[in-house]
């Protein structure tokens, strides 16, 4: 009989970051690491230094992302659109 083991490194709490999946014990969203990894080309080792995390925390976040890719990709697209809107508003205010 197989026993599935869980790694308790990713949490969701409505009181932290609106219930978005975060690395346990931090307010760091899984999507924050994924964006740094995929778009800014940061390696897992670089992410450990950038965010003061263990390698197991980084790999847990990446594994969680790939297991929930569709939902988290929607969240990332939403974050990118919000960032663009904020940037456009800031630029228009400055001019």
Where is each model-derived feature located?
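Long, charge-rich, low-complexity intrinsically disordered regions
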Residues: 2-4, 9-10, 16, 38-39, ...
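Short, amphipathic alpha-helical "recognition" segments used to contact nucleic acids or chromatin
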Residues: 27-41
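Short, Lys/Arg-enriched anionic-surface-contact patches
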Residues: 8-28
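Structural motif
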Residues: 23-25, 52-55
């Amino acid at each position: 009989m197989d026993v599935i083991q869980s790694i308790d490194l990713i949490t969701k709490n409505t009181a932290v970051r609106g219930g978005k999946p975060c690395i346990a014990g931090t307010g760091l969203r899984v999507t924050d690491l994924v964006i740094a990894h995929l778009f800014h080309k940061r390696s897992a080792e670089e992410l450990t230094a950038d965010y003061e995390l263990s390698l197991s925390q980084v790999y847990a976040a990446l594994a969680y992302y790939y297991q929930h890719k569709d939902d988290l990709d929607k969240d990332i697209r939403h974050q990118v659109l919000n960032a663009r809107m904020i940037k456009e508003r800031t630029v228009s205010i400055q001019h």
